[in-house]
């Protein structure tokens, strides 16, 4: 037992294993702050169009408006639209809420690091990013097995010297393999910063945001 404990301590020392503590000194909070988390209380609403390249021809889009203070979400596609409350009981939530959470993570994941509590993280310095090979700090986020629509998922974030995300790898269920994508075209929208484009290893833009409005 003593040897096992020592081994675990060494592993945690090497990889900076940390419980979730979103205080200003933790790396997850530093990432959130780099995108303007300290000013997020100035935001009343965020509207945007999610675009994903399904194949060489077809693009799927859906429009969202998140009324942050009112805790309501407006959803629209080419053939439907409606508004729902985030305060609804979990078993009454519309299916599109899964899409809202998915799209919001692609757009606002830095802020989720401050909002979410059900994860653990570890850090590793001087790691090349999987696509560009840029030297970075690797921050791995692993969610618990109980919360959310896809519990147990993991995200490897590759950060620059300013704690901005260069690339990430999403690993479903904390599996060993994932698909690396970029975080590009960071723009200022009101008090916060958002990455508006994600490209794959081939350099092809496959997820992007348009019609962004932050009020």
Where are these regions (language model features)?
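Gly/Pro-enriched, hydrophobic low-complexity segments
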Residues: 135-215
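C-terminal motif of bacterial Sec signal peptides marking the signal peptidase cleavage site
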Residues: 13-16
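Sec-dependent N-terminal signal peptides
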Residues: 6-9
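N- and C-terminal low-complexity/disordered segments
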Residues: 22, 46-47, 52, 58, ...
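Flexible, processing/modification-adjacent segments and terminal tails
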Residues: 20-24, 84-153, 174
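Intrinsically disordered terminal and processing segments
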Residues: 23-28, 34, 38, 117-126, ...
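N-terminal mature ectodomain segment of secretory-pathway/periplasmic proteins
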Residues: 24-94, 125-126
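Positively charged n-region of N-terminal signal peptides that target proteins for export
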Residues: 1-4
């Amino acid at each position: 037992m003593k040897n096992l404990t020592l081994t675990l301590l060494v592993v945690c020392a090497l990889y900076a294993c940390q419980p979730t503590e979103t205080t200003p000194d933790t790396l997850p909070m530093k990432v959130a702050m780099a995108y303007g988390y300290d000013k997020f209380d100035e935001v009343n609403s965020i509207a945007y169009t999610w675009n994903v390249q399904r194949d060489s021809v077809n693009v799927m889009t859906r429009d969202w408006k998140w009324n942050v203070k009112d805790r309501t979400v407006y959803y629209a596609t080419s053939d439907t639209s409606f508004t729902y409350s985030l305060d609804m009981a979990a078993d009454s939530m519309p299916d599109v809420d899964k899409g809202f959470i998915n799209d919001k993570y692609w757009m606002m994941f830095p802020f989720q690091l401050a909002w979410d509590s059900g994860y653990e993280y570890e850090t590793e310095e001087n790691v090349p990013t999987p696509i560009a090979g840029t030297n970075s700090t690797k921050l791995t986020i692993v969610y618990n097995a109980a919360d959310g629509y896809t519990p147990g998922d993991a995200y490897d974030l590759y950060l620059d010297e300013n704690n901005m995300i260069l690339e990430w790898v999403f690993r479903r269920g904390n599996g060993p393999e994932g698909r690396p994508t970029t975080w590009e075209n960071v723009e200022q929208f009101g008090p916060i910063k958002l990455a508006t484009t994600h490209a794959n290893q081939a350099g092809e833009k496959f997820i992007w945001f348009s019609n962004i409005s932050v009020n």
